């Protein structure tokens, strides 16, 4: 049975396909597939006429969301596919084509021929969960950034109306602080709060807001240097509405993210400090760990590795390259904070790096590298985290 290599050049409204036979390395077919149901059915009919799905290797460049529908269609039709880094295809074309030609027809043929030169690594079967979690976790990240933006805007309003308010709460707008702003808003109203107001406030803070704090806040409100202006009240109410709306959406997203990651339940969820949200980001960004040959590739993917400067008689390491997903890097580094507090092995490793003279952030980076090695080992060995086996 002959093997076939299928290169697909992805674009928004159409996909150009090239099929090459492994037997004689000749082009079997070149055609264009529209990005609709009829086009996809035409592609499937063509593929099914060639051979069994196991004998067909499909590849296309990783092109953001334009390939999503095709990927899901191929997965449901039991055809494997391999996503290719566009940089690799560009370099391959440079080495095989002398003319500076850039057409969809040439690109799809280059992808097909490139597939013949490399080890075929099809996309993992859990594509639905991987893509869904990537979409949801990145949306959550954007919403959190928006929420932070509105918190800054709320602070700007308070600088005019009640500048003593935020310092009273140690520069943090906690749930108790937000409750006060929602129910009273202005310093004038807070200055006139009574015992009934305190009872409600105490319940809202779960008995954490003392009567002494309450009286101190009333005093600050009565003697504030802020201005009492209805325009600022309107602005504050609008910002609080937007802030609360984002909080609600983030909570809904987190529930869905938790549900999806629990269905997959990767082994690294058993590591202390990696909760459902962190695990979801790691799973979404890394995908199938088996696609990585060693932990070093995972380090490079996350951008947690030093740059290397080797020229002439000089050779030294540089700063962390910070390539790849910033969200993944952030989650991995943050996951190390509880690890060095509650896990003796990671804590000892962190202390060792600090004793070597490394600063806190540099030492945390080394802990993150160790964490990545642990994640790699857990998934490749198909076991949960066991502190007794950690070295």
Question: What are these model-predicted stretches?
Answer:
Residues 1-391:
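A detector of single, family-specific signature residues
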